[in-house]
Amino acid sequence: MKYWAVLLTVFNRKEKTLECLSRLFDQLPVEDLQIDVFLTDDGCTDGTAEAVENLFPSVQILKGNGDLFWNRGMLMAWKAAADSRDYDAYLWLNDDTFLYEETLTSLQRAVKDTEGKAIIVGATEDANHSKLTYGGRLREGMIPNPTGELRPVEYFNGNIVLVPQFVFRQLGYLDDYFTHSKGDFDYGLRAKKAGLQIYQIGKVLGECDEHPTIDKWCNPNVPFAQRWNMLHRPNGMPPRETFYFEKRHYGIIVACLHYLTVHIRCLFPKWWIRKQQPKRN
């Protein structure tokens, strides 16, 4: 029997969270697998925690302070799980991601095929099944099209990610320097630097709609004061965290350049958008 801890962090998305958990528990039982769910409630005010406790009493709910966001909320859940048991693997799951049937079985098979020594990632698609939204990432940032076989990737989105015990013992937890985003990308890039492998499963494992393509911090239709505020929010493009990430993985020159361009995009979003558009003959 293998034991996995499923990790989530949630904030005011009650219906999506309940659907996410329903899709997860609907897959049970799975032969030779037992799961425990650790969920960080980061200050929900919409009744999410109460609904989860009522409908899924086995879920262990941890109370955040409302300022954890994704990365630190996942970190809280992960530490609680690791403190409670020496799990064989840890499954990251976003609360807006709805697993397809046999996802757990597919992950099991991938772990066996890689001898439990690689991070396993699942791709997601939009509700219309028309495009890939999240998953493993190639060097250029693209999500590889699932073709039936395990596909090596360079890093990943944290929607569906299985971290086996072998990997956890080498890499440890998500880096708590990050508040919201970049923690998942950072974990993948650290894994590659450590010589560990990352594979995306050869079929789409779930549904998750893509977030808006233009963030508020660089959207020309948003007033400057709001853009500046959103730039520095954890779920914007916080310059210090961005610099830390870029310096760690791409060097000081790239980090300094991107620190500058992030501010230019916030200050002059229309000019930046025009600058990035391909020129026509």
What does each model-identified segment do?
Residues 23-33:
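Short, acidic, metal-binding catalytic loop of nucleotide-sugar glycosyltransferases
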Residues 4-20, 27, 40:
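A conserved hydrophobic helix/loop-capping motif in glycosyltransferases and polysaccharide synthases
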Residues 40-50:
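A conserved acidic beta->alpha catalytic loop
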Residues 98-134:
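Conserved donor NDP-sugar-binding/catalytic core segment of glycosyltransferases
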Residues 86-98:
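Short beta-strand-to-loop acidic/aromatic patch adjacent to the donor-nucleotide binding site
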Residues 161-163, 167-172, 177-204:
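A short, conserved alpha-helix in the catalytic core of glycosyltransferases
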Residues 143-163, 230:
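A recurrent flexible, glycine/aromatic-enriched loop bordering the glycosyltransferase active site
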Residues 213-214, 218-281:
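Non-catalytic, C-terminal membrane-associated alpha-helical segments of glycosyltransferases
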